Design a protein with these regions (language model features):
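Acyl-donor (CoA/ACP) binding surface of acyl/acetyltransferases
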Residues: 1-14, 18-28, 61-170
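Conserved GNAT-fold acetyl-CoA-binding loop/helix
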Residues: 27-48
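A short helix-loop-beta-strand connector motif used in the catalytic cores of GNAT acetyltransferases and
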Residues: 35-36, 48-63
Length: 170
């Protein structure tokens, strides 16, 4: 059993610790965060910007906690500027708790909030075409494959193709 909670000033230190602890793991497969993300003062400034975005309903940043209350990941919804009824889903699960079902549960919980609390009509999500585990998480939660964006991201000087999935309000 997990829970998700919106990021706040009070719990942002958990996000900072989580990101620092998992930095090398995430950077193996994702573009690196800016350097100031891992400096406490820089992170506080980034957090202030994110919380402003959250108050303005541009983003919804959630912490994922296990049954003991430990932060095991994060899951976010970013509103598309071109379509305010659509948000892009993104998530990260910590290396030491990977493959325990947390991502599937968190996606289920955030979709409930997205459609009922936040009022979105559609959620999109992208994964590297080789990231079959994340694709399974999305499919398990009712997403359908939409398209591939070729050469979408550059990670470690290699172009990565993105598989895009979407789900609409039931």
């Amino acid at each position: 059993m997990i829970s998700i909670e919106l990021m706040s000033e009070e719990n942002s230190i958990d996000v900072y610790s989580f990101e620092k602890e998992n930095r090398e793991y995430f950077e193996r497969n994702l573009p690196p965060r800016p350097a100031n993300y891992f400096d406490l003062e820089g992170f506080k400034e980034i957090t202030r910007e994110l919380l402003t975005g959250q108050r303005n309903r541009a983003v919804y940043m959630h912490l994922i906690r296990n049954s003991q209350g430990v932060m095991v990941g994060r899951i976010n919804l970013s509103v598309l500027e071109s379509d305010r009824n659509t948000a892009e889903l993104g998530y990260r699960i910590g290396e030491n708790v990977n493959n325990l079902g947390y991502a599937s549960e968190a996606v289920k919980l955030v979709l409930e909030k997205a459609f009922t609390t936040y009022g979105f009509n559609r959620i999109i999500a992208g994964t590297a075409t080789g990231n079959l585990a994340s694709q399974r998480v999305l499919l398990k939660n009712g997403f359908t494959f939409s398209r591939v964006i070729e050469n979408d991201l550059q990670i470690h000087n290699e172009w990565v193709h993105t598989a895009v999935f979407e789900i609409r309000r039931p």
